[in-house]
Regions:
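Hydrolase active-site cap/lid region
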Residues: 50-97
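Catalytic histidine-centered segment of alpha/beta-hydrolase-like enzymes
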Residues: 149-161
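Catalytic histidine neighborhood in serine/cysteine hydrolases
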Residues: 136-152
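Gly/Ala-rich beta-loop-alpha elbow adjacent to hydrolase catalytic centers
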Residues: 35-44
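Short beta-strand/loop motif that positions the catalytic acidic residue
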Residues: 110-112, 117-119, 123
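Short alpha-helix in the alpha/beta-hydrolase fold that links the catalytic acid
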Residues: 113, 127-136
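Conserved alpha/beta-hydrolase
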Residues: 1-6
Length: 184
């Protein structure tokens, strides 16, 4: 991801995030499964919904709404209501699209593939309610809720890793298992 971790760049917007994921999916095609964490999970599902770039997706600690995440961030840094509105308007102007364009509820109709949602009940960064909303918006999605692992530790939890590996290892009924698994 640009401007993420050790990657080059000084800015990561939702549009750049999605473009990077879509380039990765195209380069690795065919992709059997995508595994995403946090905002990477939501942006991965958005990308797959618009490109058909994978046969199945595992979403770990995924927010259901970018706008709600922006509101949470604004509250965490102490912005007033007016400051929050200005912050969100600035982000939307910079990205060139309303934050609600990236909501999982809005893309649910474009997603017809196996989905695994994993979230910890004690996640303080992205509340578990977000995965409950995602499960409601994405009929047929399997929801696994853990306890006591928070936002990041669940990534290394043996039971979570096993559930994700088992999910990824399954063949999708309409397509042969081939290609790569892509972790975002």
């Amino acid at each position: 991801m640009p401007a993420h971790g050790e990657s080059a760049g000084d800015e990561l917007t939702a549009v750049k995030f999605i473009a990077a994921i879509e380039r990765t999916l195209a380069r690795l095609a065919p992709v059997h499964a995508v595994i995403g964490h946090s905002l990477g999970a939501a942006m991965s599902l958005y990308s797959v919904a618009h490109t058909g770039g994978a046969n199945r997706v595992a979403l770990i600690s995924a927010p259901s709404s970018l706008k709600r995440e922006l509101n949470r961030f604004a509250a965490a840094v102490g912005l007033s209501d007016r400051g929050t509105a200005a912050f969100i308007a600035s982000v939307e102007a910079h990205v060139g699209r309303p934050a609600t364009d990236f909501d999982i509820r809005g893309i649910a109709g474009k997603v017809d593939l196996p989905l695994l949602l994993v979230h910890d009940q004690n996640d303080r960064q992205v509340p578990v309610l977000e995965s409950a909303r995602n499960a409601h918006a994405l009929p047929g999605a399997e929801l696994m809720v853990t306890r006591g692992l928070g936002h990041n530790r669940l990534l290394a939890d043996p039971a979570v890793v096993r559930a994700v590996v088992d999910f990824v290892a399954q063949e999708t009924p309409t397509q042969e298992m081939m290609g790569s698994a892509c972790t975002i």
